[in-house]
């Protein structure tokens, strides 16, 4: 099955069932996420990097995402008895010369924190790092993982439509398209 983290699938095939399959493959981890990002605006995306504020992934970020395809990725808290969640930013260079950035945040302690996500286009090519994480988390109106769909302009004539649940076993589905 192509429904594994690190795979590229047809954008039209990006469903919650696919993301649940990716999530199950991570096994019994208390904080984990399956990410699916659909490339609909007619560009090619090339992987730059993932910055993890906490947590990790055993999967290599899919390198090239053609138009009408979706990437699958995952993340999990660090192994062992550590009190961390999985928080990070994915960066893709887009063929228009800009960078697509996607934030995901699955906390360890739900008494203090909630799930959050964000998507934004940065001018030029920029790798994900701590500064990008802080901008996406604190400054650019992230969405709470509230089991609902949200849409916003993400810059440079593009919009992002996404969904994240509120669970520690999270799914994040984002569709990037022209405005």
Swiss-Prot record:
Residues 11-30 are annotated as: N-terminal region. An N-(acyl)-sphingosylphosphocholine 3 binds at residues 116, 137. A motif (Cell attachment site, crucial for protein stability) lies at residues 144-146. SUPFAM superfamilies: Cytolysin/lectin. InterPro entries: Actinoporin_PFT (IPR050677), Anemon_actinoporin-like (IPR009104), Cytolysin/lectin (IPR015926). An N-(acyl)-sphingosylphosphocholine 2 binds at residues 53-54, 85, 113. Belongs to the actinoporin family. Sea anemone subfamily. This is DELTA-actitoxin-Afr1c.
């Amino acid at each position: 099955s192509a429904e594994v983290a690190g795979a590229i699938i047809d954008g039209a095939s990006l469903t919650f069932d696919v993301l649940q399959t990716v999530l199950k493959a991570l096994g019994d981890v208390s904080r984990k996420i399956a990410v699916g990002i659909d490339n609909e605006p007619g560009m090619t995306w090339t992987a730059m990097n993932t910055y993890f504020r906490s947590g990790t992934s055993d999967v290599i970020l899919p390198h090239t995402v053609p138009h009408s395809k979706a990437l699958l990725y995952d993340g999990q808290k660090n192994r062992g008895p550590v009190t961390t969640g999985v928080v990070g930013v994915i960066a893709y260079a887009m063929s228009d010369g800009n960078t697509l950035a996607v934030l995901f945040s699955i906390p360890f302690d739900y008494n203090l924190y909630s799930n959050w996500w964000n998507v934004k286009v940065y001018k030029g090519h920029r790798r994900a790092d701590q500064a990008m994480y802080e901008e996406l988390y604190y400054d650019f109106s992230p969405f709470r993982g509230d089991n609902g769909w949200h849409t916003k302009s993400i810059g440079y004539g593009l919009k992002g439509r996404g969904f994240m649940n509120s669970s520690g076993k999270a799914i994040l589905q984002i569709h990037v398209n022209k405005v």
